[in-house]
A protein has these predicted regions:
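Short, charged helix-to-loop "capping" segments that act as catalytic/coupling loops
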Residues: 191-192, 207-215, 253-257
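Short secondary-structure transition/capping segments
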Residues: 143-146, 181-191, 265-272
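Flexible glycine-rich, low-complexity coil/linker segments exposed to the extracellular/periplasmic environment
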Residues: 152-195
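Surface-exposed loop/turn segments flanking beta-strands in extracellular/periplasmic regions
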Residues: 51-60, 161-171, 177, 281-283
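Signature for the C-terminal beta-barrel architecture of outer-membrane proteins
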Residues: 1-151, 201-203, 208-219, 223-231, ...
Length: 301
C-alpha cells in the first residue's frame, strides 16, 4: 500500500477567533486535503488445520501460508472543508469524494472485471446563538451517495457490511460516513450503522440554564427526516426512510471537566424500511417504530 497526502489549512487560534468575532468581522477558516492510495496486492488467508499437536507449536507448511492475490486499486480522495463565523452565526461545511478504479475486485464484485469508484459525501451545519449564548438554534443537512446493488437477505447495518456488485455492474457509488459521526440516536447510529445512500435534514434547538461556577444544565431536541438517494437498494424499494425525534437533558461542569445526561429517541419508519408484499410475497412485513433511552457520563482531563 502506497499512500500520499497533501493539505492546506487556515485555522485561527481560539483567542484570535474570539477577538475577531467580537469585533463583528466575517471569519472564514478552511482546509483542503487530497489523499492518493495505490494498493497492488491483498492477502487472502489460507485455511489452516486448528487441531492441536501433541508436539507443541509447529512451523507453518507451504499450503498454510497466506496467499497474496492481485488487487491493483488506485483512488484519489479530495476533502474540502470550511467554517464561517459572523457574529452569532456559524456555518460549517465539508465535502468528500472517492474516485478511482480496482482492476481485480475479488469479493467486491461477482465478476473479476475492473470496477470504477465514484462516491461522495457532504454535510452543511449551521448554528445561531441567541440570548447571550444560552439559546441555540441549528439546522444540518447532509448526504452520502448510494449504489444500486442490493442484498435483501443481509442485515441493514453498513458499519460492517458490504454488498457485492452483481454481474454487469462495474461501478461502486456508495459512500459511508465515519460511524463515529453521530447524526441521531437510532436510525443512522444503530440501524444503518452509518450514513450511506441517504440525504437527511435535521433542525435542532437547545437551551442552557446557567447554574454558576462553570456549571450548567441544557435541554435539547432535534428532528431528523431521512430519505434514500437510490431507492432500489432499500428493503422497500422506496425513497422515505423515516422521521426520528430526539430529546435530552445534559449537565456539564467545565471547571471540573464533568458531564453527563440522558437522551430519549423515537423513530417512525416509512416505506423504504418495510418489506412490501409485492417484493416479498412470502415474507412481507411493515417496519415498526423503535425507541431508545441512553444515559451517559464522563470526565474530561
Amino acid at each position: 500500500m502506497l499512500e500520499l497526502m497533501a493539505s492546506i489549512t487556515k485555522i485561527d487560534s481560539p483567542v484570535e477567533l474570539r477577538e475577531r468575532i467580537d469585533r463583528g468581522d466575517l471569519v472564514v477558516n478552511y482546509g483542503l486535503q487530497v489523499v492518493y492510495r495505490n494498493q497492488g496486492n491483498t492477502v487472502n488467508p489460507a485455511t489452516t488445520d486448528q487441531t492441536a499437536s501433541p508436539y507443541g507449536a509447529q512451523a507453518l507448511q507451504p499450503d498454510q501460508l497466506p496467499e497474496a492475490i492481485p488487487f491493483d486499486g488506485i483512488s484519489v480522495t479530495p476533502d474540502v472543508w470550511f467554517k464561517l463565523y459572523y457574529k452569532a452565526l456559524t456555518i460549517e461545511a465539508e465535502g468528500v469524494g472517492i474516485f478511482g478504479r480496482i482492476l481485480h475486485p475479488g469479493a467486491l464484485a461477482a465478476e473479476d472485471h475492473e470496477i470504477k469508484l465514484a462516491e461522495a459525501g457532504w454535510v452543511v451545519a449551521s448554528e445561531l446563538r441567541l440570548f447571550k449564548d444560552s439559546f441555540f438554534v441549528g439546522f444540518e443537512v447532509g448526504g452520502a451517495s448510494g449504489d444500486q446493488a442490493s442484498d435483501p437477505g443481509q442485515y441493514l447495518n453498513y458499519a460492517w457490511r458490504y454488498v457485492q456488485q452483481p454481474a454487469g455492474d462495474y461501478a461502486i457509488h456508495d459512500f459511508h460516513f465515519s460511524p463515529d459521526y453521530h447524526v441521531d440516536e437510532i436510525f443512522f447510529r444503530h440501524i444503518m450503522g452509518t450514513v450511506t445512500n441517504a440525504t437527511y435534514f435535521k433542525p435542532s434547538a437547545s437551551y442552557w440554564f446557567d447554574l454558576g461556577r462553570t456549571r450548567a444544565i441544557g435541554i435539547n431536541g432535534s428532528v431528523i427526516y431521512s430519505m434514500a438517494q437510490v431507492p432500489v437498494s432499500t428493503p422497500g424499494n422506496a425513497i422515505n426512510y423515516g422521521i426520528e425525534g430526539d430529546i435530552g437533558v445534559t449537565y456539564r461542569n467545565t471547571g471540573e471537566g464533568v458531564y453527563g445526561g440522558v437522551t430519549w429517541g423515537l423513530f417512525f419508519p416509512m416505506a423504504a424500511l418495510s418489506r412490501p408484499q409485492s417484493l416479498f410475497p412470502n415474507d412481507y412485513v411493515d417496519a415498526s417504530s423503535a425507541q431508545i433511552l441512553r444515559i451517559f457520563m464522563g470526565v474530561r482531563f
